[in-house]
Amino acid sequence: MPKYRSITTTHGRNMTGARALWRATGMTTEDFDKMIIAVVNSFTQFVPGHIHLRNVGALVSEQINITGGVAKEFNTIAIDDGIAMGHSGMLYSLPSRDLIADSVEYMINAHCVDAMVCISNCDKITPGMLMAALRLNIPAIFVSGGPMESGAITLSNQNVKLNLIDAITCSVDPNISDVDQQRIESAACPTCGSCSGMFTANSMNCLTEALGLAQPGNGSLLATHSDRKKLFLNAGKYIVHLAKSYYEENNYSVLPRNIANKSSFENAMMLDIAMGGSTNTVLHLLAAAQEGEIDFTMADIDKLSRKVPHLCKVAPNTQRYHMEDFHRAGGVMGVLGELHRCGLLHEDTRNILNKSLLETLLNYDIFSCDNFESKNMYAAAPAGIRSTQAFIQKNRWTSLDTDRRSGCIRSREHAYSQDGGLAVLYGNLAVDGCLVKTAGVHINLQKFSGPAKVYESQEESVQAILTGNIHSGDVIVIRYEGPKGGPGMQEMLYPTSFLKSMGLDLCCALITDGRFSGGTSGLSIGHISPEAANKGLIGLVHDGDIINIDISMRSITLEVSEHILKIRHAAEIARGNKAWTPTNRNRNISISLKAYAHLVTSADKGAVRDKSKLLG
């Protein structure tokens, strides 16, 4: 039977100094026989998805203390990708994921913590904490801050729902007046919470629910709704029970690696494919799997993407539905319920409630369950009140969306497509694979061929788009923006958003070794592996080269002869120490980013550290 880890610092004469310090934090003699449970918060005033979390940690801590543990709270950093977007700040976004994972490890191991509750929400915070949980493998529960309500505005006598992407695209839309631009900006993000579409933050919070590490409703229940408070209170209670089950009952099944096993990862990926989630989730799931020593790779994702139907569209893939509508339709459990009826899920996986997925669906799938409490939770609705505070309203929908023919979540028979919302493409341009969110690709763009317009930075591509140098039929190539080449694998939200604003999103393609925001739509292909900085073929593309893309065939091909490619390769090698680096790019790379670039692997490996460089 495992001993409390915290005994290391709370027992024995030689730990007198440690106990003296613990006493200074408020612990008593009686507390030294209890479990120490970390409340890993991520409150910050920089991020709307985290602005409301200051007092939430205290709620969780109180429940831990009441239930028999000793709660100790600390904070991680949290970068707002939307604010860091479009300038050098985005270089720090993906590296912050690994920094968060490390900081959680440091705090947990330095203080010999027994278990933890992870309070996350936005883009890199949930993945960073997930990596830490699987690395540490101590009892853990995730509970996120919840989604933002969608914005609303009246334009040309039409009521329009808004999200962050609308605020970005309107900035260069010549049809939007300065007055309306200001109105959209002021209305797009009305409350605290993670941005209101199925962007990266909400996608990841849905996936922690599917992995079994978070409670039902975690991914979709609005940040402003009073029902969400119950998730935090329950997390404080449940973590004590989980930890006691492990430490006192020798129950190893409650550990993160046993809950989030390969079958759970496959369930989570099937959810992501079915709901057309962010391509960033692939990067983060691959990274988390490596931390948990789980054999889950791009090959598994490719296999799943070929059999899972696309059942759900939420902004940015449609303007009709936002996270509040997804929740009304049953949220994560609603989609998993449909996948279960397709016979696709591993129904025996277990969660933090010590229930199998099948048992959980029987209680939380609104299409088939009779549980009043569950259905009442999924009726939680927005209030339309601007606020930075959590739990301020109790609005409810008068009915749930159980329309599986044309509603937010659909059955297989009425799916948007029998192919899922994400696809892995292969070819000479991406020998190790690349990703496209097919949920955001118009049917007329499923097969595309065009001449390349090559840029060696996001900034250069944006300038080309805004100055009219991109034309219908072009394939925009943005390279040296991968994990190593950027470094930091910037999100290309501005190029894709500006293409949309200029009316080019339905007649152009964009490919990159960088990545995309969860807010991206259009024929946007990212994560090209190997990246240019790792001698990938994308580094040899010239202006005018024809690139063929065929989503149905899962292919992406550079139509240049092997003879020409050998000549180009030799010319690149001849550049000496400048080989496989961008030409004439003016970018200040800090020491911390250089260290990141030195250790990072490619996108198809999750952009995690190359352990071989550390182990020798």
Swiss-Prot record:
E.C. number: 4.2.1.9
Coiled-coil ranges per UniProt: none
Biological or metabolic pathway of the protein: Amino-acid biosynthesis; L-isoleucine biosynthesis; L-isoleucine from 2-oxobutanoate: step 3/4; Amino-acid biosynthesis; L-valine biosynthesis; L-valine from pyruvate: step 3/4
Disulfide bonds: none
Required co-factors: [2Fe-2S] cluster; Mg(2+)
Keyword Oxidoreductase on entry: no
Positions with a binding annotation for Mg(2+): D81, D123, K124, E491
Pfam assignment, any one: ILV_EDD_C
Reaction(s) catalysed (UniProt annotation): (2R)-2,3-dihydroxy-3-methylbutanoate = 3-methyl-2-oxobutanoate + H2O; (2R,3R)-2,3-dihydroxy-3-methylpentanoate = (S)-3-methyl-2-oxopentanoate + H2O
GO MF annotations, alphabetized: 2 iron, 2 sulfur cluster binding; dihydroxy-acid dehydratase activity; magnesium ion binding
Active site: S517 (proton acceptor)
General function of this protein: Functions in the biosynthesis of branched-chain amino acids. Catalyzes the dehydration of (2R,3R)-2,3-dihydroxy-3-methylpentanoate (2,3-dihydroxy-3-methylvalerate) into 2-oxo-3-methylpentanoate (2-oxo-3-methylvalerate) and of (2R)-2,3-dihydroxy-3-methylbutanoate (2,3-dihydroxyisovalerate) into 2-oxo-3-methylbutanoate (2-oxoisovalerate), the penultimate precursor to L-isoleucine and L-valine, respectively.
Subunit field text: Homodimer.
NCBIfam families attached to this UniProt entry: ilvD (TIGR00110), PRK12448.1 (NF009103)
Protein family membership: Belongs to the IlvD/Edd family.
Name listed for the protein in its UniProt record: Dihydroxy-acid dehydratase
Organism per entry: Blochmanniella pennsylvanica (strain BPEN)
